[in-house]
Amino acid sequence: YEDNDKMMKMIFHHIDKSLEHDENDYEVRRISSAISLMQKKYEESEEHGKIAYSMNPNDPRVLAVYGEILVRNKKIDQGLELLHKALELDPIPAGQKTSDNRYRDLVLGYFCKKDYDVCITQAQKIKELEPRSWIFLLFSLNEKNNEINLKENEYFVNKYDNYSKLDWKETIKGFHLPDEEMNKNLENFTNQVIN
């Protein structure tokens, strides 16, 4: 799109109109939850997700978006339960070729929980590591074994050329982690290991 701001205003307009028309449309609530999350409106995102979940608790898309926002809002165990259920019900989401997105959500959850063993296990199931899962995996490997030489690790080596040039401070902001300490730890880690 030529004008992203114009496009976003149009999307918000249509979402608002849809909610005015039928506030109990779980699809609109699910989409509203995802959009609120992108805008870092975490409480609003959770509220939309909760309503969508109450209307359709077995829709994997609802489970995924609501589970993710619960994790981000530090209701980690409840969020992980929903994310696991989404994976169980729909391992390969519509339009996808792999389960990578489901595992990426779980990596986020276990990283936020600081359960680095499970974070590593889930990340290793991802066929194509994107920057967030890659850095969460490396951070978890480092936390698990401080003696490890990450720069010789196959996960580091395989993606270093792709991701070393990223502006990691901005990239980490894009993870939308509401925990400032976690953001700082990731920034320090990337400064030490990647830069």
Where are the regions a protein language model picked out?
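Residue-level preference for long, well-ordered alpha-helices that form the structural scaffold
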Residues: 3-7, 41, 75, 149
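Flexible helix-coil transition and linker loops at the boundaries of alpha-helical arrays
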Residues: 14-27, 54, 88-99
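Alpha-helical protein-protein interaction modules
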Residues: 46-50, 60, 64, 68-195
